[in-house]
């Protein structure tokens, strides 16, 4: 069996590591560097450049040089994040694919999906590993931001496949970093906060490292993040400042000059790096542009204090997910024993200072922020290959998953921060008599209202035998694998007929969607509870109306006309109440119908008892409804149903 390599597929840079005996080792690329820029360029001659070679020619070939592709992977073109944060920040063309995904195009019109471009970076990683090992490499563990959704994970696996790699596992970046730290750590039980601020994404994970029966158990307690916060945004803030200053001095806006823009972008990134160790730097770009009076030069002095003032809001943005991660883990800042900094952007002194202030302790400096994630991926590869035997990794899913049920409510089957892999089943039923089919509507998010969450997909379970509502037993199963990818199935327990769906990348969630869901859930917790209580009252009322009318019909002549009229009047009043939003009115009318129906129910019960005695005490068995059956508002897919 060949080696399973570990790849950190980053927004800005990527890194490769392999297990060398019992130790993970970072492998240098052909240029002698331990990290490779995640940049791909297509030249006029048809050559594809990857890494440093692509980055070097970006200034002269901005339309065909693709960077920060990770921010597009698994996303829809119409996503607000794509429109606002990507299209306005990159010189290359971002287009809408036929399936609605965000793709890129060269100036010659060649269209490419983000996984295709990312695959070029992975292909270089694969070649580097093969050159080092002297044997073919076909399997890999690839890392993704912890807050990547299902479609982004699927798209990352697709990129691996395009590159000729079987992706044995998708692992979360902070978890990989903790894995790298945990293997070397021999300090017993620890609770570690992994603060991962990379080139394009931010993650925070709270992770417990413990010795369990001689094994190093690494368990993720919670995770949070922002997939649109990273070093690229810091570069952009400085780039815009330089362009604005140049405009003040020269009256020329460089935003419309792609070549100049690329030069300023590179200068901003270089200045940012220098300001992590120096108090000030000069950005000097001669012949940046020209007008009627001659060539113009950009020469601007930037101090560390000025740069920090430009990006302080970005640093502060990273602290809110940290608070949420602690809350979800049920921990306070004092419970954290170690803070790990991962990602190149954490080299910035301001980031280190704010993280220290937030957690109240000095972050560790002995973890290489650029390499820890790849090292962790290699260790996970070693675990999967059987080469590393004393590590147990328990990761989590970042968002709750469930289905839409009666009254437009989301019924959660798997809560956020549940350890994966996991499988959860629940029995649901039909909402109408003789309903031949149900539609399973799969949702992702934190809100009570189904419409306020993200729709991941729908599928139908047909050919349900005719039966009264509430009788069919439809078992819905959610199965999340170790990669965090979801499979949903529905089975009619009476017939054994089953239907399933693997959530595809066409149902991607933008980070804005995810963040909005969590924020909305917290901000609207009270409104959600009221809505939930109102829907519960409506469902109770609907069930009572249905059962009351059905009983009257079955009892026939045993019920007087006056009794029938009284029941029907109470049903109509309750129906009218359910159309409104007054929970108390619904509950009041429900009680009135119960009281009106009580004498008839007692009479019917007495008659049934007499009939049973007459039949020699024979006891009629009725099908038993499972206790956890939830009435689901499934839509009938039969076209001619009235």
UniProtKB/Swiss-Prot annotation:
The modification Phosphothreonine is found at residue 201. Residues 615-642 are annotated as: Disordered. Keywords: ATP-binding, Chaperone, Nucleotide-binding, Phosphoprotein, Stress response. One of its GO terms (molecular function) is ATP binding. Residues 628-642 have a biased composition (Acidic residues). SUPFAM superfamilies: Actin-like ATPase domain, Heat shock protein 70kD (HSP70), C-terminal subdomain, Heat shock protein 70kD (HSP70), peptide-binding domain. Pfam families: HSP70 (PF00012). Induction: By stress conditions e.g. heat shock. Disulfide bonds: none annotated. Belongs to the heat shock protein 70 family. HAMAP family: DnaK. Acts as a chaperone. This is Chaperone protein DnaK. It comes from Francisella tularensis subsp. tularensis (strain SCHU S4 / Schu 4).
């Amino acid at each position: 069996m060949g080696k399973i390599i570990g790849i950190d597929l980053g927004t800005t840079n990527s890194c490769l590591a392999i297990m060398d005996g019992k130790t993970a080792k970072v492998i240098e690329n052909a240029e002698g560097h331990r990290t490779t820029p995640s940049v791909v360029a297509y030249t006029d001659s048809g050559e594809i450049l990857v890494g440093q070679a692509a980055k070097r020619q970006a200034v002269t070939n901005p339309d065909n040089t693709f960077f920060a592709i990770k921010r597009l992977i698994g996303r829809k073109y119409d996503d607000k994040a794509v429109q606002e944060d990507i299209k306005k920040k990159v010189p290359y063309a971002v287009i809408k694919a036929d399936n609605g995904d965000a793709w890129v195009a060269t100036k010659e019109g060649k269209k490419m999906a983000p996984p295709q471009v990312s695959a070029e970076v992975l292909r270089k990683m694969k070649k580097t590993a093969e050159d080092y090992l002297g044997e073919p490499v076909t399997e890999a563990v690839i890392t993704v931001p912890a807050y990547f959704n299902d479609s982004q994970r699927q798209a990352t696996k697709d990129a691996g496949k395009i590159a000729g790699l079987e992706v044995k596992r998708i692992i979360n970046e902070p978890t990989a970093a903790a894995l790298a730290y945990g293997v070397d750590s021999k300090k017993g039980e620890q609770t570690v906060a992994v603060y991962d601020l990379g080139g394009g994404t931010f993650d925070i994970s709270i992770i417990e490292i413990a010795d369990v029966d001689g094994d190093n158990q690494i368990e993720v307690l919670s995770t949070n993040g922002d997939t649109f916060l990273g070093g690229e945004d810091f570069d952009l803030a400085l780039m815009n400042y330089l362009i604005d200053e140049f405009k003040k001095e020269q009256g020329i806006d460089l935003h419309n000059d792609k070549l100049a823009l690329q030069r300023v972008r590179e200068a901003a990134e270089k200045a940012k790096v220098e300001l992590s160790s120096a108090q000030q730097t000069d950005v000097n770009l001669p012949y940046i542009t020209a007008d009627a009076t001659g060539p113009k030069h950009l020469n601007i002095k930037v101090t560390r204090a000025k740069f920090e003032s430009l990006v302080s809001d970005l640093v502060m943005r990273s602290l809110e997910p940290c608070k949420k991660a602690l809350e979800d883990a049920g921990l306070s800042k004092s419970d954290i024993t170690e803070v790990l900094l991962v990602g190149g952007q954490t080299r910035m002194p301001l980031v280190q200072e704010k993280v220290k202030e937030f957690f109240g302790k000095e972050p560790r400096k002995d973890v290489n922020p650029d390499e820890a994630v790849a090292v962790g991926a290699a260790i996970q590869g070693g675990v999967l290959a059987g080469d590393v035997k004393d590590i147990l990794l328990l990761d989590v899913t970042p968002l709750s998953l469930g289905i839409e049920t009666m009254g437009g409510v989301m019924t959660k089957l798997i809560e956020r921060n549940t350890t994966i892999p996991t499988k959860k089943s629940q029995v649901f039923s039909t909402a109408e008599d003789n309903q031949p089919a149900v539609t399973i509507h799969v949702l992702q998010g934190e809100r009570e209202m189904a419409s306020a969450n993200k729709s991941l997909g729908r599928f139908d379970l047909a050919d349900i035998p005719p039966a009264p509502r509430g009788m069919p037993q439809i078992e819905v199963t959610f199965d999340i694998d170790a990669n965090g990818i979801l499979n949903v199935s529905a089975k009619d327990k009476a017939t054994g007929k089953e239907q399933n769906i693997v959530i595809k990348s066409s149902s991607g969630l933008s980070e804005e969607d995810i963040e909005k869901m969590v924020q909305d859930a917290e901000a609207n917790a009270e409104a959600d509870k009221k809505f939930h209580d109102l829907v519960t009252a409506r469902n109770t009322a609907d069930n009572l109306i249905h059962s009351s009318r059905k009983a009257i019909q079955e009892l026939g002549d045993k019920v007087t006309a006056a009794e029938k009229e009284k029941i029907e009047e109470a049903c109509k009043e309750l129906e009218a109440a359910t159309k409104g939003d007054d929970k108390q009115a619904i509950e009041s009318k429900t009680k009135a119908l119960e009281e009106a129906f009580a004498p008839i129910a007692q009479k019917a019960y007495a008659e049934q008892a007499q009939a049973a005695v007459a039949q020699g005490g024979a006891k009629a068995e009725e099908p038993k409804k499972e206790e956890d059956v939830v009435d689901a508002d499934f839509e009938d897919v039969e076209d001619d149903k009235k």
